[in-house]
């Protein structure tokens, strides 16, 4: 429990209007309390950490000077919005972030009127803010609209599409874009723009000019002296900063300024509030600011489990192998014997398990920044030249490159392997990061082969199978650990389109896909039913399914994907095409976006854990409920 008496100023702030009652001279103390409160609260509950520490001063300045929620703040990505949540009526609930029934991990319109746009994926803020500014302009509304973008989001093409549109409009919309430049996404930001911004902020000449002025005038600058120094600095900045890029796109550029210097932020924002048309303010921040361990390990402290801020994160001992670990090990093993293998990630080196590969095979590793569309077509181009690219990508981010998957890869039947991490139920990160649609949107694409492993050993075999297959393949696996089946060191392959009969029983066939094989087997063995590990979503094992349809009363399909258009739909379509009428119960995720909760709670809620499978069976075939098989036996 947090002692509010340790935060006397912050305790007076329930909404931003309360913040505006403070004198500007008091805001430094408010910022210190807010940063310390964030450290203490996230230490208790876990959650996104370093990004929020980096925008404490910026968040305070924005809510202090802008009349939120009338004025609109549009945050990009959302990792950095814990300070925003704390200042907008959710301070006492911040420790519930990511927990079932608690605060969402990202801005969410249903949660607060101060959350003007729901986010979780990157690079959407400028487009959304521009849309708001256009409508305000049409209505003659004087509200201010501010997009805050950073954490690598400016490496995505969508941001430039919005800048290009906004800067070329007539009449010009009143829009402020704040570039929060911390040179990071989750991993280090990469690419030409990042290097250009780095040249601006790291210029020795510019810093020498700035520091020289401080030494000469100290804290005794008059207003006239301060104006002179600002003009002199702006003149020199023009020689070092990327103002030309944004100016040519139709934006008035201001910066770069220190994003932790509250007087500088307040001064710049006061001026920008009075200006018309598209404006861009470039601020330099440090991810993890104010917590030394996070500043020193910005990747490690991006998102954290509960920890003691006095001690920092404790290095975990030996842990159970995750599916991501299986992929990471397989990738390096296959690269050792297959020189054609190239690996691509859209800014998710750590999360997708590419750290070791990037170190051992740096010339074969391509981090394209937050650019999923480019990543996939880059892979397509590589494949045309005989390479075998492996695209390591989260299921939720694969959605952002769907046209490229369809048009550039599948249409041309190019040899690209998609290692789709975080498929199905993801858990605490909520709806924006769930992988509950991928089986549906991949299954319908011609030329695609699609697999989902039941365990770690099978995941390795599927990756090898996909690598050696001629054509586009997706291996879709979940977040976290599996049942603990240790993979072989071999690079064995599976026969394409062949399922695995796990248990030969009678009456009902339970068809499990991916992680849902485990509950199917737990229930099926107990009740003497047939259990199948389907392995392939596409192509399905037609021979086995037709044989089972001939010898069983009904099927139950079980998948951690939405039922609509999913793996079970494929089974029904196959039987229908053969003119076979058979009762089928489809178990899967509901036609709804997942909320944040633990994976276990979400699986149970969807009825695809062992207890849910058992209950569904009894609902359709009540006579299966014999005395020897109570619900408790399989829950």
From Swiss-Prot:
Cofactor binding note: Binds 1 Mg(2+) ion per subunit. Binds 1 thiamine pyrophosphate per subunit.
Q: Annotated pathway, please?
A: Metabolic intermediate biosynthesis; 1-deoxy-D-xylulose 5-phosphate biosynthesis; 1-deoxy-D-xylulose 5-phosphate from D-glyceraldehyde 3-phosphate and pyruvate: step 1/1
Q: InterPro entries, from UniProt?
A: Dxylulose-5-P_synthase, THDP-binding, Transketo_C/PFOR_II, Transketolase-like_Pyr-bd, Transketolase_BS, Transketolase_C, Transketolase_CS
Under Gene Ontology molecular function, one entry of this record is:
thiamine pyrophosphate binding
The record's PROSITE patterns line, in alphabetical order, gives: TRANSKETOLASE_1 (PS00801), TRANSKETOLASE_2 (PS00802)
Q: Does the keyword Metal-binding apply?
A: yes
| Name of the top EC class for this enzyme | transferase
GO biological process, alphabetically ordered? 1-deoxy-D-xylulose 5-phosphate biosynthetic process; isopentenyl diphosphate biosynthetic process, methylerythritol 4-phosphate pathway; terpenoid biosynthetic process; thiamine biosynthetic process
Task: Show the catalytic activity.
Answer: D-glyceraldehyde 3-phosphate + pyruvate + H(+) = 1-deoxy-D-xylulose 5-phosphate + CO2
- Cofactor section: Mg(2+); thiamine diphosphate
The EC number of this protein is 2.2.1.7
Residues holding Mg(2+): 151, 182
Q: Quick one: which residues bind thiamine diphosphate?
A: 79, 120-122, 152-153, 182, 291, 372
Q: Name one GO cellular component term.
A: cytosol
* NCBIfam families for the chain: dxs, PRK05444.2-2
- Describe its assembly: Homodimer.
Protein name according to UniProt: 1-deoxy-D-xylulose-5-phosphate synthase
Q: Which organism is it from?
A: Xylella fastidiosa (strain 9a5c)
In the UniProt record, the gene name given for this protein reads dxs
């Amino acid at each position: 429990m947090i002692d509010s008496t340790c935060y006397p100023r912050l305790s007076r702030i329930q909404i931003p209007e309360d913040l505006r009652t403070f004198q500007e001279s008091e805001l430094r103390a408010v910022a210190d309390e807010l940063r310390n409160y964030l450290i203490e609260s996230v230490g208790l509950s876990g959650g996104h950490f370093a990004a929020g520490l980096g925008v404490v001063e910026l968040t305070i300045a924005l809510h202090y000077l802008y009349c939120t929620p009338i004025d609109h703040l549009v945050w990009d990505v959302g990792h950095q919005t814990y300070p925003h949540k704390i200042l907008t009526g959710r301070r006492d609930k911040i420790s519930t972030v990511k927990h079932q029934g608690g605060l969402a991990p990202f801005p969410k319109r249903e949660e607060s009127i101060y959350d003007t746009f729901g986010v979780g994926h990157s690079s959407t803020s400028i487009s959304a803010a521009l849309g708001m500014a256009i409508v305000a302009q049409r209505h003659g509304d004087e509200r201010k609209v501010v997009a805050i973008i950073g954490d690598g989001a400016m490496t995505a093409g969508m941001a430039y599409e919005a800048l290009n549109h906004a800067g070329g409009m007539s009449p010009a919309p009143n829009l402020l874009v704040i570039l929060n430049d911390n040179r990071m996404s989750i991993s280090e930001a990469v690419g030409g723009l990042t290097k250009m911004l780095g040249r601006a902020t790291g210029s020795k000449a510019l810093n020498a000019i700035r520091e020289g002025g401080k030494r000469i005038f100290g804290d005794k600058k008059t207003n006239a002296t301060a104006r002179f120094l600002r003009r002199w600095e702006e003149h020199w900045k023009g020689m070092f900063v990327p103002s030309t890029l944004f100016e040519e796109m139709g934006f008035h550029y201001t910066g770069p300024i220190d994003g932790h210097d509250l007087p500088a932020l307040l001064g710049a924002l006061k001026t920008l509030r009075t200006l018309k048309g598209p404006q861009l303010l470039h601020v330099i921040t440090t991810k993890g600011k104010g917590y030394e361990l996070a500043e020193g390990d910005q990747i490690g402290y991006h998102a954290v489990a509960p920890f003691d801020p006095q001690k920092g994160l404790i290095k975990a001992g030996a842990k159970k192998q995750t599916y991501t670990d299986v992929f990471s090990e397989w990738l390096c093993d296959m690269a050792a014997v297959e020189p054609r293998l190239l690996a691509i990630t859209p800014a998710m080196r750590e999360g997708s398990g590419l750290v070791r590969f990037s170190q051992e095979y740096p010339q074969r590793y391509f981090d394209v920044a937050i650019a999923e569309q480019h990543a996939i077509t880059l892979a397509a181009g590589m494949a045309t030249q005989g390479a075998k690219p492996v695209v390591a990508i989260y299921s939720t981010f694969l959605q952002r490159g769907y046209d490229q998957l369809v048009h550039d890869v599948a249409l041309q039947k190019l040899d690209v392997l998609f290692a789709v991490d975080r498929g199905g139920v993801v858990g605490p990160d909520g709806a924006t990061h769930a992988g509950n649609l991928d089986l549906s949107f991949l299954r319908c694409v011609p030329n695609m082969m699609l697999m989902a492993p039941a365990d770690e050993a099978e995941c390795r075999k599927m990756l090898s199978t996909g690598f050696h297959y001629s054509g586009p393949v997706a291996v879709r696996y979940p977040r976290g650990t599996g049942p603990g089946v240790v993979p072989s060191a071999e690079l064995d392959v599976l026969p394409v389109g062949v399922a695995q009969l796990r248990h030969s029983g009678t009456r009902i066939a339970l068809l499990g896909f991916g992680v849902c094989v485990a509950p199917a087997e737990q229930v099926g063995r107990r009740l003497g039913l047939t259990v199948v590990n389907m392995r392939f979503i596409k192509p399905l094992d037609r021979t086995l399914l037709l044989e089972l349809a001939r010898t069983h009363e009904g099927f139950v399909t079980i998948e951690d994907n939405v039922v609509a258009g999913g793996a079970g739909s494929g089974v029904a379509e196959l039987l229908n095409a053969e003119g076979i009428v058979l009762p089928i119960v489809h178990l899967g995720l509901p036609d709804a976006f997942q909320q944040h909760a633990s994976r276990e709670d979400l699986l149970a809620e969807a009825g695809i854990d062992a207890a849910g499978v058992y209950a569904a069976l009894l609902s359709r075939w009540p006579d299966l409920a014999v005395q020897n098989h109570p619900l408790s036996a399989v829950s």
